[in-house]
Structure formats: C-alpha cells, structure tokens
Amino acid sequence: MSDYAKSVHQFKVRLIDGTEKNLADYKNKNLLIVNIASACGFAPQLQELQALREELKDSDFEILAFPSNDFGRQEPLDGMDIQSFCQKNYGVEFPVFEKIMVRGSEAHPLYKFLGDKGLNGKLTSTPRWNFHKYLINKQGEVVDYFFPFTKPSSTKVKKKIQRLG
C-alpha cells in the first residue's frame, strides 16, 4: 500500500490555467482546502482566506481553492474568469484550481476522499454548501473540517491551524 493511501498527497489536480498539479508538492505544509463559488453569499470569505494566508505566511501553510457549481449554480464563471474575479475583488494569491464537482457520484476523487472516513481514515463530512473547509496536516491527512458559516478569521480556525505546528 502506498505511503499516500490515507493522504491528499496521492492526488493530482489541475490549476485554473489547466496545468496539472501534484498535491504531493504540498507535502510538509498544512492545508486548508475550500470549495468556492463567486456568486455565493460566502464569497467575501475569499478576502478572509487571503488575510489568513498572509497572517500565516511564515509558517508551512497554504490554502487551496476549488471552484464548484454544485450548490445553487453559484459558480457561473469558468477558467481564468474565476481567477480574475478572485484576484480583482478579493486580492486572492493562493492557488485556485479548475472548477470541479465536490459531492455526489460525479465528485472529483479528491473530494470523495476528503468527505469519506472509509477513504481518508479520519472523518466523514461531505460539503453541504460552498465554502466548506477541510484542514489537512503536513502528512496530508484530513484532521478537521469547518462548515461554510465558520469564518476563516475565526479563533477556532486559527487555533486548529496553529496546533498543527
């Protein structure tokens, strides 16, 4: 069995420009993986996510954003239009990936893994809306999740990230 069997490091995904990215490149970084949507009422959290990234810039931490149209068809944009929206409106500098499905039988394999304890070995939590957040440790293991209404600027989120070291 692979060292990555219970790790997000086993997955390859595509950046918003179509470039393939191996999540093993984020080995030894704590991650916050978030499904985003530009037309969602939670979209202002993009600015909070960027602020969190800046606050933790000297630690081994990164945010990975995955646009999705799964909830309320709230991601009408595609490709670089999503990147442009995130940068122009919220100053986003963290990686934004290609639009994917995050729930159901058509969900991207990464999101199937994130949401299923049988696959990730830790917890079950399928996104119920946009801006569901998964906290991943440096070994690529799912360690916690936060519902959309939990702001990235919250003490709860910050403390959990800091505890990972």
Each language-model region and where it sits:
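Thiol-based oxidoreductase modules, predominantly thioredoxin-like and allied folds used
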Residues: 60-77, 93-104
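Thiol-/selenol-based redox modules, centered on thioredoxin-like
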Residues: 112, 116-165
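N-terminal "domain-start" segment that seeds a small globular fold
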Residues: 1-24, 42-44, 108-109
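Hydrophobic adenine-recognition pocket in adenosine-nucleotide-binding enzymes
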Residues: 36
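Short, internal strand/loop/helix patches
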Residues: 80-128
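Extracytoplasmic/secreted proteins, especially bacterial periplasmic and envelope-associated proteins
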Residues: 48-51, 81, 109, 156
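Conserved helix-turn-beta segment immediately C-terminal to the redox Cys motif
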Residues: 29-30, 39, 43-67, 87-90
